[in-house]
Amino acid sequence: MSEMVDLKEFLAELGKTQKELKNVIEQAKDIGLELKTNSKMTPEEANKLYKYIVEGIKEQIQANQPAKNPEQDNKDDLNTAVASKPLNKKVSKTPKKEEKSQPKPKKTKEKKKEAPTPIAKKKGGIEIVNTFENQTPPVENNPKVVSHSQIEKAKQKLQEIQKSREALNKLTQSNANNAKKEISEVKKQEQEIKRHENIKRRTGFRVIKRNDEVENESENSVTESKKPTQSAAAIFEDIKKEWQEKDKQEAKKAKKPSKPKATPTAKNNKSHKIDFSDARDFKGNDIYDDETDEILLFDLHEQDNFNKEEEEKEIRQNINDRVRVQRKNPWMNESGIKRQSKKKRAFRNDNSQKVIQSAIAIPEEVRVYEFAQKANLNLADVIKTLFNLGLMVTKNDFLDKDSIEILAEEFHLEISVQNTLEEFEVEEVLEGVKKERPPVVTIMGHVDHGKTSLLDKIRDKRVAHTEAGGITQHIGAYMVEKNGKWVSFIDTPGHEAFSQMRNRGAQVTDIAVIVIAADDGVKQQTIEALEHAKAANVPVIFAMNKMDKPNVNPDKLKAECAELGYNPVDWGGEHEFIPVSAKTGDGIDNLLETILIQADIMELKAIEEGSARAVVLEGSVEKGRGAVATVIVQSGTLSVGDSFFAETAFGKVRTMTDDQGKSIQNLKPSMVALITGLSEVPPAGSVLIGVENDSIARLQAQKRATYLRQKALSKSTKVSFDELSEMVANKELKNIPVVIKADTQGSLEAIKNSLLELNNEEVAIQVIHSGVGGITENDLSLVSSSDHAVILGFNIRPTGNVKNKAKEYNVSIKTYTVIYALIEEMRSLLLGLMSPIIEEEHTGQAEVRETFNIPKVGTIAGCVVSDGVIARGIKARLIRDGVVVHTGEILSLKRFKDDVKEVSKGYECGIMLDNYNEIKVGDVFETYKEIHKKRTL
């Protein structure tokens, strides 16, 4: 007798709950099976009820159904399966998968001892058993129509299957004893598996497949040697190990702070996802081996849907991540809300660590936002740091070298400051043969010590007489030939206003000749010239001029130079002291020979091939020729027709003239000439670079002009807290707006620097505009709105139209030919605007001996003059116990009853102050006068 199936076990295999028990009982009534809550049923009844619930195949159960022939059962099952097969199941070409047969009762009994497994489908020796709890019955589909030929083929196949079953029964009987012993072990393993399935379960089917018996006897003998129960136990063991590995992985994941996922057992849904590969990890197992007794078949259709859901979920996650990155919205973060400040702080720290690893190349003058970009810093942090340091800047302001170093220290950066001019200059050609070049000699010294006169004597010219005031106010360059060798001389001004000119001359020179008057000695500009030469690291030769005068003392001059660290050769030093006379010409040849010897020692050489590189010594505007510049070539060759640029000026060389007024075609290293063809007057000291064509020259000049314009705008807006407070406090600050026009760039620069040095806390000169050339109407319009504006012209004269416009605008134009006069007049103008210095002069002192209160008059103090003279109307301080209690004027002074103008020391007098009566005995009167003195600049 077969073992009865309990209704509760049946519900567990169907995946039904106790709440759905009534539905199952009603469905059992539909097929003629009366059930109650604790009822039991036979395996045949359970099989038919399972078919009806799961597949919708309705088979009526009769009350005392007689036993049927197995062959007849197989035929009936086949007909039923063919007639009721759902439309969604495709009919296979092989009759093995179309027919259904019922296993022998003995095997079924053994299986029921393991677990209640109602039979769902039977296909040619294959039993499909539902082993999952959450399985829902599929929707019943309309049956397909099957042809008679297919039925006949199925019947033939059924006979073959019957033969296989007979052989299988023999094998089962022989192994029955061994199977009973292993059933208990299999049950324990199955219970362990069910425990894991209750934790994590996916919908699916477990298909128990019996091996088909091979038609030939040799294959049948091999099949008989197999033990199905042993194969099942091995599979259970593998599954157990896999679940243990899964538990370990889940335990590791549980340690991470992630959202806990709900297990399928916690849900009472009627529909569930089917996930075989992820839940049981069957991908790595060969479960489709024909020799195994128990395999799993997957519902691939459901798996595809699951994969699509996973792909859609991944796509949505990617879109959310992209939106979150673009918007930087913390609410888009699915992992939870995080503080935005923490992200910024971590990001900034990472950048700082990257920056520290290598040095950053920063231009010498860089804008604030450019510094932030190069240093990979936040612009707001840079501006905030400068603000805390007392510097108010915007992102477009330029930073000087000191500010860059401060920022580098604040942000712990390693920087290397680069020269700003390097990107605008063309690299010097290194290839080529270096040839000997003439020495460049700069003549420097104090004003009126005879520098230009000495050079005139060397050149046999008289340039000093052509200079206004007999002093040099422009830098001059000349070429002199001596013994077949050329020497280039640069004459620099000696006046203190031309310090920049002397500095430029020292930068381009090879040898410096310091001219000192033997009758005057070392002066201030002499020391300055020596400092320029020392900074340029060039050898110095001293020329002791005016040796023709009587009572000169060259030893005194040498001693003064020795105190400065320049010892003569005849005193054991390194410097040559040559006595010369610019008036008589004595010592000129000796001076030239000394210069040539020094040049031979230095071995001066330069490359003549390639693009020219020259230095602008002076620039001016000449009538008929436009902007001109005096240049000295350092390397390469400058020829007529060459394109060039110098700072903001560019052009093509039209003509070149030497110091003798002769036209030349080529200018080689150490040669000087006056060139024309410039777009504007280049700044003195700028570097002239030869380029291939006009386009490159124009582009480089425009880049430099843009840079300088932005730099000027930045400097005009940049102000510190200290300067701002001074501007607020000094509301009475007086400015004199001026426009400066000069004939040359060097003179213009000297005038500007000299005037700016006159500025002080009370008055200042504001240079609105400066330029080289004549005074124009545009210059007048710049200062027409100011009451005290002045236009200063140096070595230029205004035209008739300009004079008329100046009268119309009420603008003062002043012209000068000597820089002394210009600076002194501007100094006097500033002094007139400044308030005088007030000094006090003590005049007398008197002690109060008695006080008299007179009605309608006031208090009169009876005093004795102890020092000086007390005068009427003079200012006095009333001192009590060493503290000044009142300051005012003496309104009345009497000697007894008479009014007097003053009282001398030792006499008594009566003193009454203006509007003050709180005088007490013992007070002291101290009188004084205020003296106004003019300030000096």
UniProtKB/Swiss-Prot annotation:
GO terms for molecular function: GTP binding; GTPase activity; translation initiation factor activity. Residues 61-156, 171-274 are annotated as: Disordered. GTP binds at residues 445-452, 491-495, 545-548. Residues 445-452 are annotated as: G1. SUPFAM superfamilies: Initiation factor IF2/eIF5b, domain 3, P-loop containing nucleoside triphosphate hydrolases, Translation proteins. Residues 470-474 are annotated as: G2. Residues 491-494 are annotated as: G3. Residues 581-583 are annotated as: G5. Residues 545-548 are annotated as: G4. It holds the Pfam family IF2_N. One of its GO terms (cellular component) is cytosol. InterPro entries: EF-G-like_DII, IF2_II, IF2_N, P-loop_NTPase, Small_GTP-bd, T_Tr_GTP-bd_dom, TF_IF2_bacterial-like, TIF_IF2. Residues 197-208 have a biased composition (Basic residues). PANTHER family: TR-TYPE G DOMAIN-CONTAINING PROTEIN (PTHR43381:SF5), TRANSLATION INITIATION FACTOR IF-2-RELATED (PTHR43381). This is Translation initiation factor IF-2.
